[in-house]
Amino acid sequence: MNKYRQKLVTFGGGTGQFHLLDGLRDLNETSFITSVASTWDSGGSSGRLRTELGVLPPGDIRRCLLALMEDKEQRKVAQRLFDDRLEEVSGPLRGHSLGNLITARLDNIYRGQDRGIDAERKLFRINAKVLPATLTDVELIAETSSGLKISGETNIDYRVKDKDFDPKDKIVRIYFDSRTDTNEKVIESIRDAHKLIFSPGDLYTSILPHLLVDGVSEAINKSKAKLIIVLNLATKKGETDNFKASDYLKAFSFYLGGGNRIDYLIINDNHLDAEIVETYRNEGQNLVEIDEEKCIKIAPKMKIIKKDVAMYLKNDHLLRHDPVKLAEAILSL
């Protein structure tokens, strides 16, 4: 199969970026793909390694590396290895993801996460590039409409579990606790790209923080690459409650310094069963409503691309982007 040879740069974190890369890997030459991974995770195995070893959080980097392995059988084995958690051991290693430990250890051995990632790419024969968003150890802070300040990505993520949580107290601003050093390799990749893609994912804790990193939004605004945003399928409780498509675009526009830079918004347009809608509603989430007129007012030059890009994992009751369909939609633009 002939593959596309588009220079692509993706920004994101979590499962959203994983599924995006999973599709792009099979349809585009991987040596033309650069994935920028988030590095401000403060919880779980990643957060512990960050505290205990002084490394940048390895979780999202691990996911990107896994998604970009081209050999299917190798990827299957690596997934079992990377996702294995050491629950049967006692002591400080208990609960750690083995993949996180490998990434963190290479960081220490090669004296820097960027060099450690390159070593891991060689180890697993990964042609695509994976870059940390920043090499600075930073804490993400969110401010709500009441003036409440929440420090740490995990604390922002889990604020819904607080007994005093008020869904009307919305996040209005995010920032880092200190200035971030620019990762020049990220800036170079943006400069050389044909397409810049923001993956689906947690808006305020995974996606928008990329635009807080020094030099990134400026480089995007100077770039001639097409800027593509993949709209989330559903809202997230405590983060994007009752958000419509225009609310997502407002947030992007704010951190980009205006909506004129956005070229494409990819949305799902296939019919989703009432069962799916009800399942998500019971979890305090809604499918994202598309208010086209407001979207165009925010980003006048933007084209809305409507495609069947969703899949429902019935056994897990999860709505996800279909990797291949999403990649096809992006590469065809």
Features from the language model and the residues they span:
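Non-transmembrane, aqueous-exposed alpha-helical and coiled segments at domain scale
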Residues: 1-7, 22-25, 31-32, 40, ...
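Metallocofactor- and cofactor-centric catalytic cores in central/energy metabolism, strongly enriched
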Residues: 2, 15-18, 26-28, 32-35, ...
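A short helix->loop->beta-strand "cap" motif at the edges of active sites that frequently abuts
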Residues: 29-31, 223-227, 262, 300-302
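Short internal beta-strands
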Residues: 33-39, 226-233, 263-272
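Electropositive, gly/pro-rich neighborhoods at or near active sites that engage anionic ligands
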Residues: 38-166, 329-332
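An anion/phosphate-binding loop that grips the pyrophosphate of nucleotide cofactors and donors
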Residues: 193
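Charged helix-capping and loop-helix junction motifs
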Residues: 210-217, 243-248
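C-terminal functional extensions of proteins
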Residues: 242-333
